[in-house]
Amino acid sequence: MSIALCIVSISFLAAPHSSQAMPETPDRWFAYRSFRPASEPIGQFAELGVETVCIFPANTDCSLGVPYCASPPIWTGPGRYDFASLDAQVSLVLDANPKAKLLCLVDLNTPHWWVRLYGRQSGFEDTFYNQGKTIATPKWREDTKAYLQAFLTHMQTTYPGLVQGYVLACGGTTEWQDCSWGEESATRRAAWRAWMKERGKPDPIDIPPASVREHVTHGIFRDPQEDALAIDYWRFAHWITGDGILYFARAAQDIVKHEAALGVFYGYILELANNRLLYEGHLDFDRVYRSPDLDFFISPGTYHDRQIGGASGYMVALESLRHHGKRFLHEIDHRTHTSKSTVALGVAVPGHTNGFPDEQATIAGLRREFSLALIEGTALWWFDMFGDWFKGQAVLDAIGQMENLWEDFASESRESASEVAMIVDAESMLYVDGKAPIVREFMYNQRAGLYRMGAPFDIISMADVSDKDMMQYKLILFPNLFVVDDAKREVLRSKILRDGKTVVWVYAPGIIDGKTYDPAHVETLTGHAYGGESLTSKQMDGWTSVFAPKPNLPAPVLHDLAEKAGVHLYVDTQEPVYANGRFLSAHTLDGGDRTFRLPRKCARVTELFSGRVVAENADTFTDHLDAPATVLYRLDD
């Protein structure tokens, strides 16, 4: 296929339906998932009231070297599909729970036979680890689209109304993670050349070598002139991942026609730190979030700070998803004290060392994840990965109680209580050395301090600030706003730098204006000279500018900044706290008496896991927390 034909195929077929109205958002699922679904746990969860089950009829192996799915592959050869294997997996669920509804992952990764059959050609590689080398290959797109549409047609016609949502799964760990480090293939090179030409830029002929695409001119920063080719290439590398997602989302909707929800794992700007964020293709999320063909997004709870006593948290800019009318599903895959954490090859499941050590810790940890999902308005599934994640009557009883609380409260409209926002910028990370250790400090590690400052917060993409109401936020943190051009400067002026807000700038805010790198830009934007060692504050015209020369502000500093900004602080203990207008939750490792301050007087405050009324007609109360524990308070007027 010629270069021109290759790129026409990509650009045309990935275009969204311009006339398609935004689809309805899916339900807030409370679901069960497993790589090894079995009758007993599905039946046990059904007895708890959990009627939604996620299946993954996969064709490929996972990163631990074992198959994702114990059943035979479905995609067995060119145009050959063994739907008897798929039907058997559906039957297993329905036999265990005849009332079940399904969520279903669709494996778009290259089967082993496909790589062997076509892999002598450049660009015909295993998408699990080389997604970026193959995602622009027309043959792969066409074959995989045919499989996807045949799969969906079979499910939609054989089991009408059974599947509530499909998940398009591809790339590393089926989460659209490109592990190819930007390396070349013939089809990637063709797509890159066409992408540059479409934007009126010179034909680059080749993909820049590692010495060019990894080069930084100013410390950790690329120069917008000297390193322009590298910046363009990394922008393309993320774009092509987003383009692949949108291509298959449109292909799926040609069959599903918005009768079931459609989702992906994507947008991990908070989680993919150094050695990952620049390389793995997730920085096109602003465009993907806007797609009318996608309804929901998924990620596991963060793998940072997930231990008992940790704060947990999300990998994505959750408030931006809400802003675009999308839903989010929180994957609770946290290792419990009963988890099968070593697979057949003797390899431990990632995150095992931060697992919950005993039954009490498991219950406290699962309650933390549940409370976070309930308060943030997300869906969830309990991921019984390789089996035995949720064993023992006490653990099952705890999940059953949480299901009852979900039934009682999940349908309520969410009332935000956040007066703090962290605004993250995808574009700026294209200008940063992807391997620099400091990258971990900007967003990945910063979440821990935010969750412990004593107040709830939102995470928003800079791309959404221009058309989002920002009035509720009193304290705004910019952990990585390194590129500020004229358009961003105007957004900041009109939406952020006003109304008495306190704005915290981190490390090198605005050091690049899109055309030049100049440390003087920092002072022009913030009123503070670039550099220094300590936090400095300056009163501006209608707002307060705070400059933090070092990233990853700790909880005590954030607590003090929030207090000075007039943010309501629920606690002073530097332990994880989550809140919205109707709920307050806290998680503790050590336990003891804790005093909570409410933003208003409440007629009744009830701790929902114990059923205790802990306060009446009060705006403060003290409660005793076990060690470890998660508490969830209902705030009734």
Feature locations, PLM:
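An acidic-aromatic substrate-binding cleft motif
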Residues: 22-51, 234, 420, 427
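Hydrophobic faces of well-ordered beta-strands that scaffold small-molecule active sites
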Residues: 28-32, 53-55, 102-106, 164-168, ...
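Short, acidic/polar
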Residues: 34-46, 151-154, 275-289, 362-370, ...
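Aromatic-lined substrate-binding rim segments of carbohydrate-active enzymes
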Residues: 39-127, 152-154, 247-255
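Aromatic-lined carbohydrate-binding/catalytic grooves of carbohydrate-active enzymes
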Residues: 50-84, 269-283, 292-299, 303-305, ...
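Polysaccharide-binding and catalytic clefts of secreted carbohydrate-active enzymes
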Residues: 107, 115-303, 311, 317
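Carbohydrate-binding surfaces of carbohydrate-active enzymes
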Residues: 258, 291, 295-637
